[in-house]
A protein has these predicted regions:
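Alpha-helical transmembrane segments and their immediate juxtamembrane cytosolic regions
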Residues: 1-259
Length: 259
């Protein structure tokens, strides 16, 4: 089937194209949370949130790929950190969460860019070839636990750190990459079902829809070097716009768990 598709001129998805898909899915999901806050059970609303599950695993995958291909890890990490800081204010404004962490909750206290930043550090810690200093296995594990702890209060909690590392360590084995992500997210689903909402907890399994997109990833960055900046700029900007829309529609009301 794949060969037939490629013979018809389809060369697969570039990294930039995957980012566009993630942007679309993410925007749909965030707009839905802004316009229809809470956990509505209308089928069309659930479908929107299900499509939105494509965004996070695509980000994890692209962090792993970006780390693999980057020629300057320090600049790569600096870019992630800068936008993690900017995205914190945009994310919390978007969903009506206090800008001061842990003021009202320990969940969803900052955006997913923060654990993505920590994920990149985790990749470096476990990369014996690129890392400039030696580490024993127990030291790697200890650092990973610290990274997970730091990521815990974020959107998607510590799972971006764990899933990104799993994706990178199994690079080239798509089946293992995806099934490993699903295994990790199973723990996230359990927490959702027990503490928040069963239906929306089960929707988190929707990350599996990333499988065909990863399958047809062609390993290229794609046209437009500006995309490495556009994704982060768009991420921050769309959150600010969603926050303004939230104020217009619902006044100063929190629209997700964490506020």
């Amino acid at each position: 089937m794949e060969n037939e598709i490629r013979e018809k001129g389809f060369s697969g998805f570039s990294g930039n194209q995957l980012k566009i898909f993630a942007i679309i899915a993410m925007t749909m999901d965030h707009l839905a949370s802004t316009i229809w806050p809470g956990y509505g059970k209308e089928w069309w609303l659930l479908c929107i949130h299900l499509i939105g599950r494509l965004a996070a695993p695509t980000m994890w995958f692209m962090i792993a790929e970006g780390y693999h291909y980057t020629r300057n890890f320090r600049k790569y990490l600096q870019r992630l950190f800068i936008f993690a800081v900017l995205a914190h204010f945009a994310y919390n404004f978007c969903f009506g969460i206090s800008l001061i962490p842990f003021r009202d909750s320990v969940l969803n206290q900052t955006s997913v860019i923060w654990p993505l930043f920590l994920s990149a550090i985790g990749l470096y810690i476990y990369d014996d070839e690129k890392r400039s200093f030696p580490l024993k296995n127990w030291q790697k594990t200890a650092i990973l636990l610290v990274l997970c702890l730091l990521a815990f209060p974020s959107d998607w909690s510590c799972f971006p750190v764990l899933c990104t590392l799993h994706i990178y360590q199994n690079r080239g084995n798509l089946r293992k990459q995806v099934l490993g992500m699903v295994a990790y997210i199973s723990m996230y689903v359990i927490v959702w079902c027990l503490c928040i909402d069963v239906v929306y907890g089960l929707i988190q399994f929707g990350i599996i829809i990333v499988w065909p997109f990863m399958h047809f990833y062609n390993g290229t960055r794609g046209k437009g070097r500006w995309m490495k900046w556009f994704f982060y700029v768009f991420y921050v900007s769309h959150l600010v716009l969603c926050g303004i829309l939230r104020l217009i529609l619902h006044s100063n009301v929190t629209t997700i768990v964490g506020g």
